């Protein structure tokens, strides 16, 4: 039985890895072994950071809401509790956007939360 070298399959696999490694620095975009290691590491980073991004944005939104809430004399937690009591269902992303781009609308929401907390 003759030996099968598998040249086209191997070349295709290596070409695919080197294509993914395009733009990497130094030998990481030319040498297959190093490129393969870096592509696998990059995939791990991408997987991890897709989840991390959600946490980072939530932290950013909370920080922005807290800053705007404190300008209205409320803490973040008191503002959120007041909004929940008054039945206003606005998510953190929308609240943070209001805090940055439309402060008057945010102030109205904060006043509604304050009124509900003072009842």
UniProtKB/Swiss-Prot annotation:
Pfam families the record matches: Ribosomal_L20
GO cellular component, one term: cytosolic large ribosomal subunit
Gene Ontology MF annotations: rRNA binding; structural constituent of ribosome
Keywords linked to the UniProt accession: Ribonucleoprotein, Ribosomal protein, RNA-binding, rRNA-binding
Biological processes annotated in GO: ribosomal large subunit assembly; translation
Recorded superkingdom: Bacteria
InterPro entries: Ribosomal_bL20, RIBOSOMAL_L20_CS, Ribosomal_protein_bL20_C
Oligomeric form and interacting partners: Part of the 50S ribosomal subunit.
HAMAP family according to UniProt: Ribosomal_bL20 (MF_00382)
Family the UniProt entry places it in: Belongs to the bacterial ribosomal protein bL20 family.
Function: Binds directly to 23S ribosomal RNA and is necessary for the in vitro assembly process of the 50S ribosomal subunit. It is not involved in the protein synthesizing functions of that subunit.
Name the UniProt record assigns to this protein: Large ribosomal subunit protein bL20
């Amino acid at each position: 039985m003759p030996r099968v070298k598998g040249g086209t399959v191997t070349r295709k696999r290596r070409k695919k890895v080197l294509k993914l490694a395009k733009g990497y620095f130094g030998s990481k975009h030319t040498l297959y072994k190093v490129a393969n290691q870096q592509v696998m590491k990059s995939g791990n980073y991408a997987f991890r950071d897709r989840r991390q991004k959600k946490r980072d944005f939530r932290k950013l939104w909370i920080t922005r809401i807290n800053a705007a809430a404190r300008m209205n004399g409320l803490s973040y937690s008191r503002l959120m509790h007041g909004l929940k009591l008054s039945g206003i269902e606005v998510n953190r992303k929308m609240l943070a956007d209001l805090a940055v781009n439309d402060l008057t609308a945010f102030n109205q929401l904060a006043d509604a939360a304050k009124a509900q907390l003072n009842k």
